[in-house]
A protein has these predicted regions:
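Carbohydrate-binding surface patches
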Residues: 363, 369-372, 377-379, 415-454
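Aromatic-lined carbohydrate-binding/catalytic grooves of carbohydrate-active enzymes
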Residues: 126, 139-140, 144-247
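C-terminal beta-strand-rich structural cap/linker in extracellular carbohydrate-active enzymes
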Residues: 470-492
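Proline/serine/threonine-rich low-complexity linkers at boundaries of modular beta-sandwich domains
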Residues: 20-31
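Solvent-exposed, low-complexity, repeat-rich "mucin-like" stalks and linkers
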Residues: 31-56
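Glycan-recognition surfaces
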Residues: 220-223, 269-380
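Strand-loop-strand motifs at the edges of beta-sheets in extracellular beta-sandwich domains
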Residues: 69-85
């Protein structure tokens, strides 16, 4: 996919619009299987996984050694069913088209753990806030497929606040959706999303009300979890508004919902959103959470703002040192991606005060989030992405680094001359490196690869240039706020 890398380089460096279409580039040539090489699910619950693959269509998919209870649709690459027996199941996936064939192993873990790699998908909050409805969500699901995002591993479509009716069902206490926004109900949306090989997420709050003052989940945890299961929900983001700001309250309330989700009869990924208070990285995994917010909300800013309006650099500074808490099924969450909003997001622009990042800064934002093994949740309008946004969100090298099954979060290993260097170990014994220029002036960096790897023979893939010729060192010029990312892996 060197063409895409070259296109991205032109987009982020010279900031020109181009006529080439990312989707066309993704669907040329022999099949390539992307995304996670491992996925988890609870036993006796619905399983859904789409083999993420690009290449010329049609592609015919096949699977060897699927666990009993699962079936693969050979045309769509969607695997679904129910597995009763816990265990580790290595599955051989084959994809064939007119241009060639590829084989990839997929490890299916049926047991107690979900989100074995960082969740990838989309969330409604940054761009839409309360302006959500059934029609828009269905269009967003279609856009995730038609853009090529699903075929690169994006799978969650997450509804944030404001899906609620004015009150719960007075007789049963069950949550009720706003009938004007969702005339066919939430199950209808879930069924549609699932038919596309995607998963549906929803939002609630550990308090009596959500941050938007809709009804919260406090004291209704079991009712809500079972209702979400009936609706076909696959992920819950659980906020912390209208709650006494005490650690004991956080632990108690998040545990109740964690227990309720575990007993819901469905594999529901649990996102804890208490903005980093009380060090959630230390206790969320014990309560059943899969990822946790490390800071207050992100805004469309490179740097500056205050404690409740975090910029990319604010969040990045707070992330250093948290890497030891990240791993398979438990991830630090530095909040959603800003990429593609350009100051137009209803939430992230702060009502138009913040004008957004440059494409160079959006790429750096995406690159460092990928290196940090963060959940990658886009929150722009997928229906109207420009080519730069598509190229950034669908950068195959960054996504591969993020989804690496070793599950390591990058560490900052240098901050010399305002160039921050990050290193992330990868499952094949290689490393990913990122060089971020945090200053407002161009920096020249001399990279000696031997400082970062013990491998004697290796290849180098640049996230913006494709495969490079290996030399002992490489000198690069980094523009202000620019990031370059390299993946090093052993050669035979």
């Amino acid at each position: 996919m060197r063409l895409i890398s070259a296109l991205l380089l032109s987009l982020i460096c010279v900031q020109l619009s181009v006529a080439q279409n990312i989707q066309q580039l993704l669907y040329e040539g022999a099949p390539v299987i992307h995304g996670a090489q491992v996925t988890g699910n609870y036993p006796n619950t619905d399983f859904l996984f789409t083999v993420p693959a690009t290449g010329e269509r049609p592609i015919q998919f096949a699977a060897e050694n699927l666990p009993e209870g699962l079936n693969l649709d050979g045309t769509t690459g969607i695997i679904k069913g129910v597995v009763k027996k816990s265990g580790t199941y290595p599955v051989k996936i084959t994809a064939i088209n007119a241009k060639g064939k590829t084989v990839q192993m997929l490890l299916i873990e049926i047991g107690d753990n979900l989100a074995l790699t960082p969740p990838m998908g989309w969330n409604s909050w940054n761009v839409f806030t309360k302006y959500i409805d059934e029609k828009m969500l269905i269009e967003m699901a279609d856009a995730m497929v038609s853009s090529g995002m699903r075929d690169l591993g994006y799978q969650y479509l997450n509804i944030d606040d404001y899906w609620h009716d004015v009150a719960r069902d007075s007789a049963t206490g069950k949550p009720v959706v706003d009938p004007k926004k969702f005339p066919n109900g939430m199950r209808y949306v879930a069924d549609y999303v699932h038919s596309k090989g995607l998963k549906l997420g929803i939002y609630s709050d550990a308090g009596t009300m959500t941050c938007g003052k809709c009804f919260g989940g406090y004291t209704y945890e079991e009712i809500d979890a079972k209702t979400y299961s009936e609706w076909g929900i696959d992920l819950l983001k659980y906020d912390f508004c209208h709650v006494p700001l005490k650690k004991s309250e956080a632990l108690s309330r998040y545990k109740k919902m964690g227990d309720a989700l575990k007993g819901s009869g469905r594999s529901i990924v649990y996102s804890v959103c208490n903005w980093g208070f009380f060090g959630p990285w230390k206790w969320v995994p014990e309560l059943g959470g899969n990822y946790w917010r490390t800071t207050p909300d992100i805004f469309d800013l490179w740097k500056g703002a205050g404690i409740w309006q975090m910029s990319v650099m604010n969040i990045l500074k707070r992330s250093h040192g948290l890497e030891k808490y990240a791993g398979s099924g438990q991830w630090n969450d530095p909040d959603m991606l800003l990429v593609g909003n350009y100051g137009k997001g209803h939430a992230t622009s702060a009502n138009g005060r913040f004008k957004g990042l440059t494409d160079t800064e959006y790429f750096s934002h995406m690159a460092i989030w990928a290196m940090m093994a963060s959940p990658l949740l886009s929150s722009c309008d997928l229906r109207s992405m420009n080519e730069a946004t598509k190229a950034i969100l669908m950068n195959e090298t960054l996504l591969r680094i993020n989804q690496d099954k070793l599950g390591k979060q990058a560490s900052r290993v240098s901050k010399k001359d305002n160039v921050w260097t990050y290193k992330k170990d990868l499952h094949h014994g290689g490393v990913a490196l990122a060089f971020l220029n945090t200053s407002n002036s161009t920096k020249q960096v001399n990279i000696d690869w031997k400082n970062y790897t013990d491998m004697s023979n290796f290849k180098i893939i640049s996230a913006t240039e494709g495969q490079l010729t290996v030399t002992e060192n490489r000198t690069v010029n980094l523009a202000p706020h620019q990031t370059l990312v390299f993946e090093l892996s052993a050669t035979k």
